[in-house]
C-alpha cells in the first residue's frame, strides 16, 4: 500500500468520524457533506490549487492562509479546521486521495445519493431546489424502506441526498438530474425534449 493510500485512508476515516461526532442531526450532517462536495468541485476545476498544496516551498502557514482567503467564508468551520490540520501535519499534499476515499467510504457504508442538478446558464433561470430536494428525498426514502439490504452505519432514519448545482451552457430551458451515485441521468431540459422529438420524427 502506498503512502498516499495509507494517509488517505486514515484521514478520510478521521474526517467522516469528525463530521458524524460534531453534528447532532441528519440535516447538519448533510450540510457538512455538501460543503465537502463544494470543496471538491472547486478543487477539481482548479488544478493549480492541488499544485500549490503539493509545492514544498510554501509553508503550512501560507497554505492555511490560502485556505482561509479562498474558502474561509464559505465552508463550515469544522471542515476548515480539518483542512488546517492537514496543513499542520503536512498531509495536505494527499488531499485529493483523502477526499476521494472519504466519499467512497460514505457512499459505500450509508444509504447516500449524490444528485447533480444541471441548469441553463444565466441569471434569469430559476429552479426551486428546495422543492426538488423534498420530492427526491421522499422518493429515495421510499426506496430505502423497500430495500432490506440497505446499510446505514450512521443510523439515520432518512436517505442522505446531497445536491450540487452545475450550470451547463446550451441546456436552454428546463433542467437535468444527474444521479451520480446511481449512474443515471433524467433529462427535463428543452434540448432533451427536442432530441426525443427528433428521434420520433426520424423513426
Swiss-Prot record:
Recorded topology in the membrane: Peripheral membrane protein
Listed GO CC annotations: chloroplast thylakoid membrane; proton-transporting ATP synthase complex
The GO terms this record gives for MF are: proton-transporting ATP synthase activity, rotational mechanism
Location in or out of the cell: Plastid, Chloroplast thylakoid membrane
Keyword Plastid included in the entry's annotation: yes
What's the chief localization of this chain? Answer: plastid
Q: What does this protein do?
A: F(1)F(0) ATP synthase produces ATP from ADP in the presence of a proton or sodium gradient. F-type ATPases consist of two structural domains, F(1) containing the extramembraneous catalytic core and F(0) containing the membrane proton channel, linked together by a central stalk and a peripheral stalk. During catalysis, ATP synthesis in the catalytic domain of F(1) is coupled via a rotary mechanism of the central stalk subunits to proton translocation. This protein is part of the stalk that links CF(0) to CF(1). It either transmits conformational changes from CF(0) to CF(1) or is implicated in proton conduction.
Q: Into which family does the record put it?
A: Belongs to the ATPase delta chain family.
Q: What's the subunit arrangement here?
A: F-type ATPases have 2 components, F(1) - the catalytic core - and F(0) - the membrane proton channel. F(1) has five subunits: alpha(3), beta(3), gamma(1), delta(1), epsilon(1). CF(0) has four main subunits: a(1), b(1), b'(1) and c(10-14). The alpha and beta chains form an alternating ring which encloses part of the gamma chain. F(1) is attached to F(0) by a central stalk formed by the gamma and epsilon chains, while a peripheral stalk is formed by the delta, b and b' chains.
Name of the protein this chain belongs to: ATP synthase subunit delta, chloroplastic
Species source reads Heterosigma akashiwo (strain NIES-293 / 8280G21-1)
Source gene? atpD
Amino acid at each position: 500500500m502506498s503512502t498516499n493510500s495509507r494517509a488517505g485512508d486514515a484521514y478520510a476515516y478521521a474526517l467522516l468520524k469528525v463530521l458524524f461526532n460534531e453534528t447532532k442531526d441528519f440535516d447538519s450532517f448533510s450540510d457538512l457533506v455538501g460543503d465537502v462536495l463544494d470543496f471538491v468541485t472547486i478543487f477539481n476545476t482548479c488544478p493549480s490549487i492541488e499544485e500549490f498544496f503539493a509545492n514544498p516551498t510554501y509553508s503550512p502557514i501560507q497554505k492555511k492562509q490560502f485556505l482561509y482567503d479562498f474558502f474561509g467564508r464559505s465552508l463550515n468551520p469544522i471542515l476548515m479546521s480539518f483542512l488546517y490540520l492537514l496543513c499542520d501535519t503536512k498531509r495536505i499534499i494527499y488531499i485529493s486521495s483523502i477526499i476521494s476515499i472519504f466519499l467512497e467510504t460514505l457512499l459505500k457504508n450509508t444509504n447516500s445519493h449524490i444528485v447533480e442538478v444541471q441548469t441553463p446558464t444565466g441569471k434569469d433561470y430559476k429552479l426551486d431546489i428546495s422543492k426538488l430536494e423534498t420530492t427526491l428525498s421522499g422518493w429515495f426514502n421510499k426506496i430505502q424502506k423497500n430495500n432490506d439490504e440497505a446499510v446505514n452505519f450512521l443510523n439515520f432514519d432518512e436517505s442522505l441526498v446531497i445536491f450540487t448545482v452545475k450550470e451547463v451552457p446550451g441546456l436552454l430551458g428546463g433542467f437535468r438530474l444527474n444521479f451520480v451515485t446511481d449512474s443515471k441521468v433524467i433529462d427535463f431540459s428543452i434540448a432533451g425534449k427536442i432530441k426525443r422529438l427528433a428521434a420520433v420524427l426520424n423513426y
